[in-house]
Amino acid sequence: MINQKKIAGEKACEWIEDGMVVGLGTGSTVYYTIEKLGEMVQKGLNITGVSTSIETEQQARTLGIPLKSLNDVTKIDVTIDGADEINQAFQGIKGGGGALLREKMVAQASSKNIWVVGEEKLVTELGKFPLPLEVIPFGWKQIKRMLENDGVETTLRKQSSGEIYETNNGNYILDIINQTFTNPEAWHEKLAGIPGVLEHGLFLHYVDIIICGKASGEIEIIKK
């Protein structure tokens, strides 16, 4: 059985050149990208990574990939990340792994953004996957109540233990569920204006290249 995530994740490494500063995304597909980059570094590739999560940082360090914080670089040449959904307009939902705020900050600082996905992530309309909002713990119930009064259903993300999930930044996540985002731009405006919502998982103007692994073993490269 073809591992769509693995073939897409490894393919993205072909865009990495010696001397680059590389944004390292978070998730089960970009995991394979980082593993491959680790092999390339061991063979002499000279890159500097900027991680988007503690999980990614730990993986990269274990593999010997040199890292710097976002504060310590002036620009990022290429960022490789995964996605929960992406439509034909190159608009996507990210944040299933809880790293949306850091992922968006790293994407914003990048000259090029490459997303690696399996073919099930390509959709005609966003919304089957929950849309995460990173919110500060102070007053999160007010945000939830306000959204639900506006007809937007949300759920507070929790760990398997039942405890409230906390992001690497110490915040909570409200997931918008049972909602189709037919006008992502309007949703961006709506959500960005809510006090206490630090970031939402709509990525609308970032991705340049999609690398899609297919069950057949083919890899589709989709450029903006």
UniProtKB/Swiss-Prot annotation:
<dbReference type="Pfam" id="PF06026">
    <property type="entry name" value="Rib_5-P_isom_A"/>
</dbReference>
<dbReference type="InterPro" id="IPR050262">
    <property type="entry name" value="Ribose-5P_isomerase"/>
</dbReference>
<feature type="binding site">
    <location>
        <begin position="81"/>
        <end position="84"/>
    </location>
    <ligand>
        <name>substrate</name>
    </ligand>
</feature>
<protein>
    <recommendedName>
        <fullName>Ribose-5-phosphate isomerase A</fullName>
        <ecNumber>5.3.1.6</ecNumber>
    </recommendedName>
</protein>
<dbReference type="InterPro" id="IPR004788">
    <property type="entry name" value="Ribose5P_isomerase_type_A"/>
</dbReference>
<comment type="subunit">
    <text>Homodimer.</text>
</comment>
<comment type="similarity">
    <text>Belongs to the ribose 5-phosphate isomerase family.</text>
</comment>
<dbReference type="GO" id="GO:0004751">
    <property type="term" value="F:ribose-5-phosphate isomerase activity"/>
</dbReference>
<feature type="binding site">
    <location>
        <begin position="94"/>
        <end position="97"/>
    </location>
    <ligand>
        <name>substrate</name>
    </ligand>
</feature>
<keyword id="KW-0413">Isomerase</keyword>
<feature type="active site" description="Proton acceptor">
    <location>
        <position position="103"/>
    </location>
</feature>
<dbReference type="GO" id="GO:0009052">
    <property type="term" value="P:pentose-phosphate shunt, non-oxidative branch"/>
</dbReference>
<feature type="binding site">
    <location>
        <begin position="26"/>
        <end position="29"/>
    </location>
    <ligand>
        <name>substrate</name>
    </ligand>
</feature>
<feature type="binding site">
    <location>
        <position position="121"/>
    </location>
    <ligand>
        <name>substrate</name>
    </ligand>
</feature>
<dbReference type="InterPro" id="IPR037171">
    <property type="entry name" value="NagB/RpiA_transferase-like"/>
</dbReference>
<dbReference type="InterPro" id="IPR020672">
    <property type="entry name" value="Ribose5P_isomerase_typA_subgr"/>
</dbReference>
<comment type="pathway">
    <text>Carbohydrate degradation; pentose phosphate pathway; D-ribose 5-phosphate from D-ribulose 5-phosphate (non-oxidative stage): step 1/1.</text>
</comment>
<comment type="function">
    <text>Catalyzes the reversible conversion of ribose-5-phosphate to ribulose 5-phosphate.</text>
</comment>
